[in-house]
């Protein structure tokens, strides 16, 4: 008989700080603290229900599983590995000291059954959990985790479309959840104003509180007046509007309003839990989702179709429009919008050249809980990468503008060679006592070689290999063999069930020689696998990078 399980608990979780261990080593303490940090009220979207971000992206399957995971991590030996199956601890096995302390598999389904309908059946029976990307892999750091990637996207869009200057320009988008909440700050850092539509007032309040959003408008007329004023003044200010994007975008099209950039980060990947149908209140949406899920999904997807038609109308008028990876184009196509993919996704439009060089989201977390540890590592990054003014500008803006959520953390986009250099330097700082406690290095699953997602990261690959998911599997296996502290393999993150597979990695810098050896392997091999993947697809930039870095790619030959 299956035991009872609970997804709600009226409790606040915060990660321990300082140097006192709750587990038997820092390699076990780190995943313990990062799991708990994912559920910090400053970090998670709905922590009392274990939801970190992305609709129903959870850190653990239920509270009973959370309790047992914590117990396992506290008692895990230095040569044991904990196995997590969709948020549930299922085994502890003797491995070796250089093996991962935790191996995680979340939301993975045999392809024929990889649908939201089947997943929700399993979820209701307590047999599955949606891990999103960094929710179930315990390395979410709040909206900062996506800010720089969003910033890089907006900057590149400005370079391509507006000569590199977004002053006096404005972005139209929607969604202020765990991912979309980065948009207003990223836009203003890039020099543009932004109008962000969000249907939940609580999310607007949270972004205002954390400084990611500057202000809120009373209604659409007020929002447009504010944007017009800030554009005229050459100021970059973000404005939130509590409304439904499925209503607002068609109305803007009707009025002939012309934004300078248009995208979307609503939770369109999950129509049952993340996208409000037109004319519904949020309370009605949640009630009807529980009572009549099929009708709710249908209503949400109809609204998405109207949303995408409005985006297409902007595109047809010459406005740069791009999909930001929530699969809204696919949902619209399912509803009969045959030209939904006329505007591109953000990766082929703006990011892929970075992936070809193994450049992606590199993040680290100070287990001490001390902000000063992050500031010291910021300075070390600048010393080790002295000739990248764009990176230095980012680090300066991040320190000035980004408020830490939970444990202090930092993200910056760096590539092959740079990641290992930084990781080894951080480990040496721990060894010398320059940092109060060890740091954890991780990344988003959205990275160069760790994801297969034909409507997002691997859209429009040069060789047509968009849907080949061997690559994230190889990435996870390679990071496991290389000695990462924990490794995760997920399905459905970002774009929903059936549309992606992706892998995550984290490694602890505890100041030991053993850690240095693991760091050198993992932080070289992880981005190198991304260069390999893109070189195999025929990208000249990746082939050149592979040769420059001396990667052994047997089939590369003289291509």
Swiss-Prot record:
Subcellular localization: Cytoplasm
GO molecular function per UniProt: urocanate hydratase activity
Keywords, in A-Z order: Cytoplasm, Histidine metabolism, Lyase, NAD
Record-level GO cellular component terms: cytoplasm
Cofactor(s) annotated in UniProt: NAD(+)
Top-level enzyme category: lyase
GO terms of biological process kind: L-histidine catabolic process to glutamate and formamide; L-histidine catabolic process to glutamate and formate
Binding-site positions, NAD(+): 54-55, 132, 178-180, 198, 203, 244-245, 265-269, 275-276, 324, 494
Family: Belongs to the urocanase family.
Designated name of the protein: Urocanate hydratase
UniProt organism field: Azotobacter vinelandii (strain DJ / ATCC BAA-1303)
Name of the coding gene: hutU
């Amino acid at each position: 008989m299956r035991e009872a399980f609970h997804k709600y608990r009226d409790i606040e979780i915060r990660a321990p700080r300082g140097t006192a261990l709750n587990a038997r080593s820092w390699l076990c303490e780190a995943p313990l603290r990062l799991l708990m940090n994912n559920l910090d009220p400053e970090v998670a979207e709905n922590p009392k229900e274990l939801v970190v971000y992305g609709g129903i992206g959870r850190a653990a399957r239920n509270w009973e599983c959370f309790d047992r995971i914590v117990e396992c991590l506290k008692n895990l030996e230095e040569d044991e590995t904990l196995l997590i199956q969709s948020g549930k601890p299922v085994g502890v096995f003797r491995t070796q000291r250089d093996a991962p302390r935790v191996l995680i598999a979340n939301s993975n389904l045999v392809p024929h059954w990889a649908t939201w309908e089947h997943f929700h059946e399993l979820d209701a029976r307590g047999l599955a959990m949606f891990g999103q990307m960094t929710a179930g892999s315990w390395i979410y750091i709040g909206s900062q985790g996506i800010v720089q990637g969003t910033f890089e996207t907006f900057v590149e869009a400005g370079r391509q479309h507006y000569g590199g200057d977004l002053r006096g320009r404005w972005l139209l988008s929607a969604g202020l959840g765990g991912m979309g909440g980065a948009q207003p700050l990223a836009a203003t850092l890039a020099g543009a104003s932004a109008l962000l539509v969000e249907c939940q007032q609580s999310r607007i309040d949270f972004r205002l509180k954390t400084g990611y959003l500057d202000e809120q408008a009373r209604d659409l007329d007020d929002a447009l007046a504010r944007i017009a004023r800030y554009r005229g003044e050459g100021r970059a200010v973000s404005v939130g509007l509590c409304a439904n994007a499925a209503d607002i975008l068609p109305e803007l099209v009707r009025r002939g309003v012309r934004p300078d950039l248009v995208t979307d980060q609503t939770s369109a990947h999950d129509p049952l839990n993340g996208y409000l149908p037109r004319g519904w209140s949020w309370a009605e949406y949640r009630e009807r989702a529980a009572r009549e899920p099929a009708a709710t999904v249908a209503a949400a997807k109809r609204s998405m179709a109207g949303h995408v038609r409005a985006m297409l109308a902007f595109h047809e008028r010459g406005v740069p429009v791009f999909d930001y990876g929530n699969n809204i184009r696919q949902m619209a196509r399912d509803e009969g919008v045959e030209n939904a993919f006329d505007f591109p996704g953000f990766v082929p439009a703006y990011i892929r050249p970075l992936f070809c060089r193994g450049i992606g989201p590199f993040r680290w977390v100070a287990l001490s809980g001390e902000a000063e540890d992050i500031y010291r590592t910021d300075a070390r990054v600048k010393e080790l990468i002295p000739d990248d003014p764009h990176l230095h500008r980012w680090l300066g803006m991040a320190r000035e503008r980004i408020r830490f959520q939970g444990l202090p953390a930092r993200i910056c986009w760096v590539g092959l060679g740079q990641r290992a250099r930084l990781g080894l330097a951080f480990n040496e700082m721990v060894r010398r006592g320059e940092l109060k406690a060890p740091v954890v290095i991780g990344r988003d699953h959205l990275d160069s070689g760790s994801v297969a997602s034909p409507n997002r990261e691997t859209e429009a690959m040069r060789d047509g290999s968009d849907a080949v998911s061997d690559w994230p599997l190889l990435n996870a296996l390679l990071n496991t063999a290389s000695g990462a502290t924990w490794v995760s393999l997920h399905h459905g993150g970002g774009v929903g069930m059936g549309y992606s597979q992706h892998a995550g990695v984290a490694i602890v810098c505890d100041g030991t020689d053993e850690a240095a050896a693991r760091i050198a392997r993992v932080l070289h091999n992880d981005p190198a696998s991304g260069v390999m993947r893109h070189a195999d697809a025929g990208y000249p930039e990746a082939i050149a990078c592979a040769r420059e870095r001396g990667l052994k790619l047997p089939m590369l030959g003289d291509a």
